[in-house]
C-alpha cells in the first residue's frame, strides 16, 4: 500500500469512531429521558383490577371517610380542611357540584389517613361551619347500579304487573310460563285490572241482563219484550193492521 492509501484508511477509521461515539451519546441521552419520564427508572404499566379488588379498595377507603352535609354554597375546601384539621391528617376532600348548572349540591366527602381520625371527626356532628350546622356521618359505600328505592318500587310494579305483591318474575329457563290467576279475577281480564278491588264478572249469557231468545214470528217477539223504561217497539205489520181497521170503522 502506498502512503496516500494508508492516510485515507486512517481518516476513515477516525470518522467511524467519532460517529460511533456520537451514537452512544445519543443512546445514553435517550435512556436518561425515558428514566425521567418513568418512576424509579422503569416505566410502570397500569394493571386492570377485577370487580372484587375494586370493591375491596372502595371498602377500605370508605372505612376512613365521612359524609359532610348541609354545607353552604360559598364554603371552600380550605375552610373544610381548617374545620377538621384537629381530627387528623386529611388525604382528600371532595365537594359535589351539579353537572348542568355548576352550583354546589351542599354536601361532600372527606377521606382521612386512618379510621381513628374518622371517629374523631364524627364527634363534630352538629357543629357550625360559617354559621350553619353541618351533618357528619360515615360514608356509605356506593354500589354501581343499585337503587335504594328499588325494593319499594319493585313491589308496586309487581303488584300492578302480576297482581301479586311479592311474586317473582318468570324464569326464562322454564318457558312457557303463565302466572296463575288470582281467585277474584277472571281469565278475560288484563293483569292489574283488579288493583282497585273492582270485580268484573266474566262474559257469559247468565250474567247479562239481556239474553238471546229465538222467536218464530214478529208477533211473538213483541209479546216478550223485557220490562224497561223504554217505549215498546211497534212492528211495521201492526201499524198496517191498525190503519186498515180505522178505515173499515169509518
Curated annotation (Swiss-Prot):
PROSITE patterns: RRM. GO terms for biological process: mRNA metabolic process. It is found in: Cytoplasm. Residues 191-208 have a biased composition (Polar residues). Residues 64-141 form the RRM domain. One of its GO terms (molecular function) is poly(A) binding. Gene3D superfamilies: 3.30.70.330. Keywords: Cytoplasm, RNA-binding. One of its GO terms (cellular component) is cytoplasm. Residues 1-27, 178-250 are annotated as: Disordered. It comes from the Eukaryota. Its main location: cytoplasm. mRNA-binding protein that may play a role in modulating the expression of cytoplasmic mRNA. Present with 6490 molecules/cell in log phase SD medium. This is RNA-binding protein SGN1. The lineage of its organism: Eukaryota, Fungi, Dikarya, Ascomycota, Saccharomycotina.
Amino acid at each position: 500500500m502506498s502512503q496516500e492509501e494508508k492516510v485515507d484508511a486512517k481518516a476513515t477509521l477516525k470518522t467511524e469512531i467519532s460517529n460511533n461515539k456520537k451514537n452512544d451519546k445519543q443512546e445514553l441521552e435517550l435512556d436518561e429521558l425515558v428514566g425521567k419520564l418513568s418512576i424509579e427508572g422503569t416505566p410502570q404499566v397500569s394493571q386492570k383490577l377485577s370487580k372484587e379488588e375494586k370493591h375491596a379498595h372502595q371498602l377500605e377507603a370508605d372505612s376512613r371517610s365521612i359524609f359532610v352535609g348541609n354545607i353552604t354554597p360559598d364554603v371552600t375546601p380550605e375552610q373544610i380542611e381548617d374545620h377538621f384539621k384537629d381530627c387528623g391528617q386529611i388525604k382528600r376532600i371532595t365537594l359535589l357540584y351539579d353537572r348542568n348548572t355548576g352550583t354546589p349540591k351542599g354536601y361532600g366527602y372527606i377521606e382521612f389517613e386512618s379510621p381513628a381520625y374518622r371517629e374523631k371527626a364524627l364527634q363534630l356532628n352538629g357543629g357550625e361551619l360559617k354559621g350553619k350546622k353541618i351533618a357528619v356521618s360515615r360514608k356509605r359505600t356506593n354500589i354501581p347500579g343499585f337503587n335504594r328505592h328499588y325494593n319499594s318500587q319493585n313491589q308496586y310494579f309487581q303488584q300492578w304487573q302480576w297482581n301479586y305483591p311479592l311474586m317473582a318474575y318468570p324464569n326464562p329457563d322454564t318457558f312457557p310460563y303463565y302466572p296463575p290467576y288470582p281467585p277474584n279475577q277472571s281469565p278475560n281480564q288484563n293483569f292489574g285490572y283488579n288493583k282497585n278491588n273492582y270485580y268484573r264478572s266474566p262474559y257469559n249469557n247468565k250474567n247479562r241482563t239481556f239474553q238471546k231468545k229465538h222467536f218464530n214470528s214478529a208477533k211473538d217477539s213483541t209479546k216478550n219484550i223485557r220490562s224497561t223504561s223504554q217505549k215498546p217497539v211497534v212492528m211495521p205489520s201492526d201499524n198496517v193492521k191498525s190503519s186498515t181497521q180505522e178505515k173499515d170503522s169509518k
